[in-house]
Amino acid sequence: MNNNSIHPMQSLEWGEFRQKTGLKVIREKGFQLTIHKIPHTPWTVGYLPKSPMPTKEMVVKLREIGKKEKCIFIQLEPNVKQMANGKWQMANLGIRPSFHPLFTKYTFILDLTKSEEDLLKSMHPKTRYNIKIAQKHNVEIIEDNSDKAFEEYLKLTKETTKRQNFYAHTENYHKLMWNTLKTQ
């Protein structure tokens, strides 16, 4: 993955994957967004996931793109923690965060230089409890980037979505992502 991006969803590789799904990807200095057609209309929606906090210059550029691409709106989901008052400081830019984000509000980085004991101490009690349950059932976490492991992932995803009754992307979507993003 491109190490210069703020988040994997802002990487060149992610943009290439999204282009392969049929979306228009617009890359600008410091961010990339996707343009989604609204069926049976001339309109589109822009989507900017996991970007840096928007600046005044970025908002001006987004407005230009929005007009050119006939966007009815551009959904912003910056990869930043909320401020102490629980709000992002975007009102002064004339924008607001999405009411219904598609992804987690922000991604955090876990410092793996800490001891296991210190890491566990910093976790929520429920997280520690779930780890102990997994250990009790001999759950192993391994890194396996083989095609066989990917097929197992697809099988587990299908079983989980059926059992838990939630939506996940299609098998073809996951295969396209895998083939685009996996290391050769």
PLM feature spans:
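Acyl-donor binding region in acyl/amide transferases
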Residues: H40-G86, N92-F103
